[in-house]
């Protein structure tokens, strides 16, 4: 990843991808795994940074950047952009039932939900395989959804092919709706997010069928919940069919997705792994509180131990993905304390929140588009230019 020694990852990628459920790697946190998790976090963070959330924009709900410029423009590192290329965007309909309002910008019939990327040839050399990444976007306003969350569980048999299982797996209605809803009248959501992603994964698996491959699904907050469902679907329905292609989800601040039946199914699916990064004071991974079960392996962090952050902090800080990555960078496990083990800029934690101590002189919520997307033309008049269009320049 952007902060990983390439040779180490290339040689150990199956171990780092969870082949042995990360045994012996979490406490103390393995250096290569630490960097790898942060790298996948950066791929998830890019979805938040690129999303047009301003309701007054005619492009609200879209991605600011085209596919070919995405990783470069969404503030991902140069190294990271060189390791992956985005091959597809995917969308979900804004009318999905049971979806918390903060997940969507409601003035569009569909919302951009994330992207599919694949390792470049340089990425293959650095990562040891052709990694396919599915990155899900999180919420628009991260915390407001908690007050209105619908905890209804519904059958997942239609997605996971789990008919006849006992207990039958059930999942959160809202997460399932985001994943499976479609709108024939929509330009972008004629197919569900599930179908859009499945089609692209099938295409990439066929294109690289003679290579060693992996699939990694990443997300933060509600995006992590849908990523969990997505990863289970990929394995349950054999989309990783070419050879032994492992599927791993890296989920930051993930709310619970399903019941004990879903956990049983998840645990039984071959080649499926999930690393659940949880910040101890963050309440989101503890929701919904009843009737649901955790899946995967937990990587605990505690940003309250960081000497860089204001104390005691607040829920917005504890839930922030940038703060999560800061926590991963400095986590010391059971021995306690906090020490940055990788060179990750502490200014990043203030990108969207007010977390850093005043002595670092970094303004809170500093990540704003220059002039709010307004550009002055040759005629001296200002015009909103906050959207490049999805189509890559090479396709135009």
UniProtKB/Swiss-Prot annotation:
The entry sums up its family as follows: Belongs to the AB hydrolase superfamily. Lipase family.
- The active site consists of 221, 282, 319
Q: Which species is this record about? A: Oryza sativa subsp. japonica (Rice)
Q: Name one Pfam family in it.
A: Lipase_3
> How is this protein named in the record?
Phospholipase A1-II 4
| Annotated InterPro entries | AB_hydrolase_fold, Fungal_lipase-type, PLA
Gene Ontology molecular function = phospholipase A1 activity
Q: Which GO terms describe its biological process?
A: lipid catabolic process
Q: What is its EC number?
A: 3.1.1.-
Cell compartment(s), UniProt: Cytoplasm
Q: Which PANTHER family match?
A: PHOSPHOLIPASE A1-IIGAMMA
What does the protein in this record do?
Acylhydrolase that catalyzes the hydrolysis of phospholipids at the sn-1 position.
Where does it sit, as one GO cellular component term? cytoplasm
Primary localization: cytoplasm
Q: Which UniProt keywords apply?
A: Cytoplasm, Hydrolase, Lipid degradation, Lipid metabolism
* Keyword Hydrolase annotated: yes
Q: Has keyword Cytoplasm?
A: yes
Which PROSITE patterns does the record match to this protein? LIPASE_SER
């Amino acid at each position: 990843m952007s902060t990983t020694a390439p040779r180490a990852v290339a040689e150990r990628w199956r171990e780092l991808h969870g082949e042995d459920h990360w045994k012996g790697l979490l406490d103390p946190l393995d250096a290569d795994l630490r960097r790898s998790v942060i790298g996948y976090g950066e791929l998830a963070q890019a979805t938040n940074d690129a999303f047009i959330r301003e309701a007054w924009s005619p492009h609200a709900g879209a991605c600011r950047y085209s596919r070919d410029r995405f990783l470069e423009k969404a503030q991902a590192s140069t190294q990271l952009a060189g390791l992956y290329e985005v091959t597809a965007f995917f969308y979900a309909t804004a009318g999905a039932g049971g979806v918390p309002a903060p997940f969507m910008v409601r003035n569009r019939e569909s919302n951009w939900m994330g992207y599919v990327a694949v390792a470049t040839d340089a990425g293959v050399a650095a990562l040891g395989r052709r990694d396919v990444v599915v990155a899900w976007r999180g919420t628009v306003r991260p915390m407001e959804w908690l007050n209105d969350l619908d905890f209804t569980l519904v059958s997942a048999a239609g997605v996971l092919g789990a008919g006849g299982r006992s207990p039958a797996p059930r999942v959160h209605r809202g997460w399932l709706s985001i994943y499976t809803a479609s709108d024939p009248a929509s330009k972008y959501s004629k197919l569900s997010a599930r179908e859009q992603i499945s089609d692209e994964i099938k295409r990439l698996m066929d294109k690289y069928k003679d290579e060693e491959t992996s699939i990694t699904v990443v997300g933060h907050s509600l995006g992590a919940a849908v990523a969990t469902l997505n990863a289970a679907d990929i394995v349950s329905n054999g989309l990783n069919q070419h050879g032994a292609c492992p599927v791993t989800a890296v989920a930051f601040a993930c709310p619970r997705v399903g019941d004990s039946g879903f956990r049983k199914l998840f645990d039984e699916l071959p080649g499926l792994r999930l690393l659940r990064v949880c910040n101890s004071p963050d309440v989101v991974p503890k929701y919904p509180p009843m009737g649901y079960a955790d899946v995967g392996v937990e990587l605990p962090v505690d940003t309250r131990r960081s000497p860089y952050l204001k104390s005691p902090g607040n829920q917005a800080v504890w839930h922030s993905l940038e703060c999560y990555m800061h926590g991963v960078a400095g986590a010391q496990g059971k021995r306690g304390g906090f020490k940055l083990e990788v060179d990750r800029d502490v200014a990043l934690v203030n990108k969207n929140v007010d977390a850093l101590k005043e002595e670092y002189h970094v303004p809170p919520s500093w990540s704003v588009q220059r002039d709010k997307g307004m550009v002055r033309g040759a005629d001296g008049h200002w015009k909103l230019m906050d959207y490049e269009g999805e189509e890559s320049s090479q396709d135009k």
